Curated annotation (Swiss-Prot):
This is Glutamyl-tRNA(Gln) amidotransferase subunit B, mitochondrial. One of its GO terms (molecular function) is ATP binding. Allows the formation of correctly charged Gln-tRNA(Gln) through the transamidation of misacylated Glu-tRNA(Gln) in the mitochondria. The reaction takes place in the presence of glutamine and ATP through an activated gamma-phospho-Glu-tRNA(Gln). It is an enzyme of class 6 (ligase). It is found in: Mitochondrion.
Amino acid sequence: MHYSIIRKLVTAPKLANVPKRKWKSVVGLEVHAQIASASKLFSGSGTSFGAPLNSSVAYFDASIPGTLPVLNRKCVESGIKTSLALGCRVNEVSMFDRKHYFYADLPNGYQITQQRAALANDGKMTFPVITPGKKVYYKTAKLLQLQLEQDSGKSLHDDYLKRSLVDLNRAGLPLMELVFAPDLETGEEAASLVKELILILRRLQTCSCKMEEGALRVDANISIHQEGDPLGVRTEVKNIGSVRSISQAITYEINRQLETVANGGVITNETRNWDAENRRTVAMRDKEVLQDYRFMPEPNLPPLHVNLKPGSMSTEDLLSVAALSEEIPELPEDTRQRLVEQHNLNAETAIILVNEPILLDHFLSITRSLSDLPNKVICNFLINDLLTYCNKLNLDVEDCSIKADDLKDILMSLHAELINLQAARQLVDLLHNNPKAKVSELIELHSLQQICSPDEIENLCQLAIANQAKAVEQYQKGKAKALFAIAGEVAKLSSQKANMKLVVQRLEKLLKPTNK
């Protein structure tokens, strides 16, 4: 936000005629996270993204008569670990149900899910909300339930040949559905929740969270109402494909509903699609007629039992929640607290580092190697220089080819005053484009050494004084800021290589009234 979120959250276009009365927006999220598993939820077929069409399909996935589901133990473990990390109550017994509906890419005619008794309930997420230009604050959203379910296949529509094709590679992929209470109010809060969830799931290694591959899908339920009134009619927005789009889609939909009310219209209960190209929501289908999914118990799967006893161990046929809780790593908020308490970072810096795991890795690696280098100097360089450089290239930090050892060498050279900040920034660009090069070689090759020689500094200052006569006069009349113009002239004359600390010190001595 980068903060990696700050970079990615872009406010959606504002609409006209928004009512001026006090209205509140209410947002609830449903998140489908694909479990990181080598095989599907109820079959042994593979889960690789991008596999040839219909190449990862078991008989069960294609609904061949006589085939039965076999529950994937790894998926249950991942579901339990995720539930614990999100503060849920894991249920000792959960059950599977059939949810009936007809799609061409759902060969069974039903989806196996957990409607009546989910794997876990009653969790919550507390997360930092980062809004450009505003102070960071924390928000809490309740997690109503986390359930296991299978994904459907994928329909491919060929308009030219007027036909539809079905790819069943996705059919049966393992999903965790996380249903959050409508505790959010803005698009920024929703995007921040999803960003935090991504950080948690990646720490747990229970989901890749690659939204571009469909590994994490977000639906938003949005409504508006006047303060003190019951909740309004909600709309559901689907097809939100990125963290940035979550903020944009929800912000747009809130404004659309406000404008509709201002113009005397009525909000209808409908499903809308997010059109990322035109940055607007588009009506898909009504939800006014409640669809009957005819939920019924899944007869081919027994109730799922887990062991809730403290200190218990998992066995071949019974998973221990206590044992799985021992496998949960440090979570993002714990890392933020550690950075604040042990490394004396401020809260906002800690949030930025945790939001960008590669920056956090670089920071911890550098602090271990360069204990005498102030943490503030390291953070400033990583955030203000490396991150800014990546943002300008529209590049994720993890895709930047600069290694942690190279960053250490740059910071060591900077701290030793061998180079200045301008040269350090130049080295970032050079190393990204030449990842095999060494910092010392690049400094020599491009003559990036800082000018620290007293004689050279003296000559440069004298030239700058001669070139900036007006600024010199202003400075000697008491306008202290005029010194910046003279120092800037030195930087220009030295091709940004002069040690500016020494330059300022020398200029102050040269321009004292007694030195006229």
